[in-house]
From Swiss-Prot:
Descriptive protein name: Breast cancer anti-estrogen resistance protein 1
Name of the gene this protein is made from: Bcar1
UniProt function note: Docking protein which plays a central coordinating role for tyrosine kinase-based signaling related to cell adhesion. Implicated in induction of cell migration and cell branching. Involved in the BCAR3-mediated inhibition of TGFB signaling.
Region (Substrate for kinases): 119-420
Modification after translation: PTK2/FAK1 activation mediates phosphorylation at the YDYVHL motif; phosphorylation is most likely catalyzed by SRC family members. SRC-family kinases are recruited to the phosphorylated sites and can phosphorylate other tyrosine residues. Tyrosine phosphorylation is triggered by integrin mediated adhesion of cells to the extracellular matrix.
Motif (SH3-binding): 639-647
Organism field: Mus musculus (Mouse)
Domain notes: Contains a central domain (substrate domain) containing multiple potential SH2-binding sites and a C-terminal domain containing a divergent helix-loop-helix (HLH) motif. The SH2-binding sites putatively bind CRK, NCK and ABL SH2 domains. The HLH motif is absolutely required for the induction of pseudohyphal growth in yeast and mediates heterodimerization with NEDD9. A serine-rich region promotes activation of the serum response element (SRE).
Polar residues bias locations: 139-155, 621-659
Lineage, broadest ranks: Eukaryota, Metazoa, Chordata, Craniata, Vertebrata
UniProt keyword Membrane, yes or no: no
Region (Disordered): 71-177, 374-394, 409-450, 610-662
CC per GO annotation: actin cytoskeleton; axon; cytoplasm; cytosol; focal adhesion; lamellipodium; membrane; plasma membrane
């Protein structure tokens, strides 16, 4: 009896790469003469248009039940290998099957004409059967599988096909094998749904690379480290056609609901899909009718078989009497006639604080323009904003009494801020706890020109030059002192010789006095800046600068104390070389402290010092404190129009935030890892790209604000580097022979305590950062939290740099330097990825990259701490 050959359909185009291979196009029907011909796994011998050749089997689909009426012989192709008997195995057991017996010409069976996507189930006739496990259809990927090299040698299959155990295609073996000629029906064919003709997927990731995540995956904290949960990274919720899925909690995104569902089935659709505007007892809850995206239509008179009508707008008018299934399908009803409806904060996760329930302004949140008087280009008047203003329209300030009474008439409303705002203290805190605090507002330009009683503020350019000169003076004098005294580990130091000789007394005294003088001059400059900070628009700048100044004051007092001990003790019996060592150890940290103070002043120079005015045609004395209105108006026209005035703490609860659109990026860009010139260049490029963030500034909850303030205090706490007053928790025990010296061990133990204390702060900052990202906070929030992470980790970099300079052992210096450089590189990466995540918000891939960098930083800081502990115990 002649066995007809099975037909196969081409799923992809194929270009022949050898003379023995067939070329075909997608959709061609060809006759399969032999599978795995001559032992070539995956290569089938086929006939197409009268020509025979081998083709890659993974680019074909067997047409079940369809055979070639005119059987085609093997022809000139390679001869088929005779089939071999297959050992008896129970059903469901996978065993290697010889290729010739695994795929053989199919026996004729009775069948009815069916569609191309239905498998036939012939009547079983044998007791054993050979099993071949193949993947089920998955419409997730569209790239054709790679074909194997067209050689005639035995090869291993190019891909392995993992699939669930239920998707088994039972291919009948050869005629000589005691097997069953049967196909098992796949699970999807029995439910009557369409089967997609898509090649099998190799894994949850395709040939084109990793699919970008649809949601940012935040690691969870385990002990002191952070790990990703494996279950979260494998959730592919969008790769199955929706009509094949039952309604469930996964239907939460951008697809309108299906008609005919009950009201309680809409609870999970909480994002971008508005509910249907249905009135009457059978309609949906009116509390859910919020936004302006057209939902699907729900008609009670239609059958439930109709699905997902998209193009009928929702109802806007709510002033008609309620009736059964009454719809208002119109857009032209003014919002003022709409019925007020309560605001449900659970429907909007980005709006953390809802307005009061009795407020009538909660009705039309986004699609109603603000009142006409709220314009940006009109100076504010005496009108106070009403409760219905829900936009970021600047509130009007209360004018000073003399303006309200009409005694002073002045068109320059932006030139000088009212005294009430410039002098009155406020309890409001700004959200950003940056190292710069540079805020651009309508008051910043004018507050620079306010003269402090008794002293004239320096011009901006002169102040910056003086600051650089003072910082350089501190570094130069300290370097001269260290060169004179010499490091304890240096070969040329005064203690490195066999007979230690102290440096000359006069030279040492002059070097110490020079250090004192340089630090004192820098402190005087900083004190003047602190005085200027009381008159800036940033209410927190004075407190931040005062903390930086106090840190430098403590360093200066320590230098003075050690210098006095050195002067009074030299030549006396009580003087020891350790006194000089303490002075040297204290002096080593002075340049770094001066650099931090100078960096802070440099970043806020535009707020602390007076801008250089452009020369005018009038006399030099025209720039007095109280110019006439004409001069003031001309000065306003000569500079750019300032941004709208800020909210006051009494006007709005979000008074903690800056009103400048680019203020958060300006605060964030300068974190002591980037120069001011580079910052100004990149800042201009960023702001020219357009709107970095247009959404309103959300209001933090009380708990988040408390956490933010606590982190700000912890991050601003300076590192204790006074080794002279430190006593170890346990007495120092001598290490093993050939280990660290006592000075290195004491140094490591001292900074190990500092490292552990700062690791706690860093862990808290990372937790708060991950919480902000997981709750989808805007860039204003997560950028501020990332600054806490960066500043906390920067303290560990400072500890590593200090240890690498002061340690004597080469092994300690090399390991500490390695981890310090690693942390510094990670911080640069976090700065770059955070900028990208803020600019591309709400891109999940950019945010995920930022989260991964912070997670890597957490692991590296734990390794740094362990290395310090191991070195101290050596």
């Amino acid at each position: 009896m002649t066995v007809p050959n099975v037909l196969a359909k081409a799923l992809y185009d194929n270009v022949a790469e050898s003379p023995d291979e067939l070329s075909f196009r997608k959709g061609d029907i060809m006759t399969v003469l032999e599978r795995d011909t001559q032992g070539l796994d995956g290569w089938w011998l086929c006939s197409l248009h009268g020509r025979q050749g081998i083709v890659p089997g993974n680019r074909l689909k067997i047409l079940v039940g369809m055979y070639d009426k005119k059987p085609v012989g093997p022809g000139p192709g390679p001869p088929a290998t005779p089939p071999q008997p297959q050992p008896s195995l129970p059903q469901g057991v996978h065993a290697p099957v010889p290729p010739a017996s695994q795929y053989s010409p199919m026996l004729p069976t009775a069948y009815q004409p069916q569609s191309d996507n239905v498998y036939l189930v012939p009547t079983p006739s044998k007791t054993q059967q050979g099993l071949y496990q193949a993947p089920g259809p998955n419409p997730q990927f569209q790239s054709p599988p790679a074909k194997q090299t067209s050689t005639f040698s035995k090869q291993t299959p190019h891909h392995s096909f993992p699939s669930p155990a239920t998707d088994l295609y039972q291919v009948p073996p050869g005629p000589g094998s005691p097997a069953q000629d049967i196909y098992q029906v796949p699970p999807s064919a029995g439910i009557g749904h369409d089967i997609y003709q898509v090649p099998p997927s190799l894994d949850t990731r395709g040939w084109e690379g990793t699919k970008p995540p649809a949601k940012v995956v935040v690691p969870t904290r385990v002990g002191q480290g952070y790990v990703y949960e494996a279950a979260q990274t494998e959730q592919d919720e969008y790769d199955t056609p929706r009509h094949l899925l039952a309604p469930g909690p996964q239907d939460i995104y951008d697809v309108p609901p299906v008609r005919g569902l009950l009201p309680n089935q809409y609870g999970q659709e909480v994002y971008d899909t508005p509910p249907m505007a249905v009135k009457g007892p059978n309609g949906r809850d009116p509390l859910l009718d919020v936004y302006d995206v057209p939902p699907s239509v729900e008609k009670g008179l239609l059958s439930s078989s109709h699905h997902s009508v998209y193009d009928v707008p929702p109802s806007v008018s709510k002033d008609v009497p309620d009736g059964p299934l009454l719809r208002e399908e119109t857009y032209d009803v003014p919002p003022a006639f709409a019925k007020p409806k309560p605001f449900d904060p659970t429907r909007h996760p980005l709006i953390l604080a809802a307005p009061p329930p009795d407020s009538p302004a909660a009705e039309d949140v986004y699609d109603v323009p603000p009142p006409a008087p709220d314009l940006y280009d009109v100076p504010p008047g005496l009108r106070r904003p009403g409760p219905g203003t829900l936009y970021d329209v600047p509130r009007e300030r209360v004018l000073p009494p003399e303006v309200a009474d009409g005694s002073v008439v002045d068109d320059g409303v932006y030139a000088v801020p009212p005294p009430a705002e410039r002098e009155a203290p406020t309890d409001g805190k700004r959200l950003s706890a940056s190292s710069t605090g540079s805020t651009r507002s309508s008051q910043s330009a004018s507050s620079l020109e306010v003269v402090v009683p008794g002293r004239e503020p320096l011009e901006l350019e002169v102040a910056v030059e003086s600051l650089a000169r003072l910082q350089q003076g501190v570094s130069t004098t300290v370097a001269h002192l260290l060169d004179l005294v010499g490091s304890a580990s240096g070969p040329g130091g005064w203690r490195g010789t066999s007979e230690p000789q102290e440096p000359p007394a006069q030279d040492l005294k002059a070097a110490v006095a020079a250090v004192h003088g340089a630090v004192h001059e820098l402190l005087e400059f900083a004190r003047g800046a602190v005085s200027n900070a009381t008159h800036t628009s940033d209410r927190t700048l004075h407190a931040k600068l005062s903390r930086q100044l106090q840190k430098m004051e403590d360093v200066y007092q320590t230098l003075v104390v050690h210098g006095q001990v050195l002067d009074s003790g030299r030549g006396s019996p009580g003087f020891t070389p350790e006194d000089l060592d303490r002075l040297v150890a204290c002096s080593r940290a002075v340049p770094e402290d001066a650099k931090q103070l100078a960096s802070f002043l440099h970043g806020n120079a535009s707020l602390l010092f007076r801008r250089t005015k452009a020369p005018g045609p009038g006399p030099e004395g025209s720039s007095s404190l109280h110019p006439n209105p004409t001069d003031k108006a001309s000065s306003i026209q000569s500079r750019p129009l300032p941004s709208p005035p800020k909210f006051t703490s009494q006007d709005s609860p979000d008074g903690q935030y800056e009103n400048s659109e680019g203020g958060w990026m300006e605060d964030y860009d300068y974190v002591h890892l980037q120069g001011k010139e580079e910052f100004e260049k990149t800042q201009k490029e960023l702001l020219e790209r357009g709107n970095i963030m247009r959404q309103g500034k959300g209001q933090l909850e009380l708990q988040q604000l408390k956490q933010f303030e606590r982190l700000e205090q912890e991050v601003s706490r300076p590192i204790d580097h006074d080794l002279a007053n430190w006593t170890p928790a346990q007495p120092l025990v001598p290490g093993r022979t050939g280990g660290l010296g006592p000075s290195d061990r004491q140094l490591l133990l001292f900074y190990l305590e500092q490292c552990e204390a700062n690791l706690t702060t860093l862990t808290d900052a990372v937790d708060a950062f991950f919480t902000a990202v997981a709750t989808n906070q805007p860039p204003k929030i997560f950028v501020a939290h990332s600054k806490f992470v960066i500043l906390s980790a920067h303290k560990l970099v400072f500890i590593g740099d200090t240890l690498s300079r002061q340690a004597k052992a080469a092994d300690v210096r090399s390991q500490v330097t390695h981890y310090s450089n690693l942390l510094c590189d990670l911080l640069r990466g976090i700065v770059a990825t955070t900028k990208a995540a803020a600019l591309q918000y709400p891109s999940p891939s950019a945010a995920q990259d930022m989260v991964d960098r912070v997670k890597e930083l957490g692991h590296s800081t734990q390794q740094f701490r362990r290395v310090l502990g191991q070195l101290a115990a050596a």
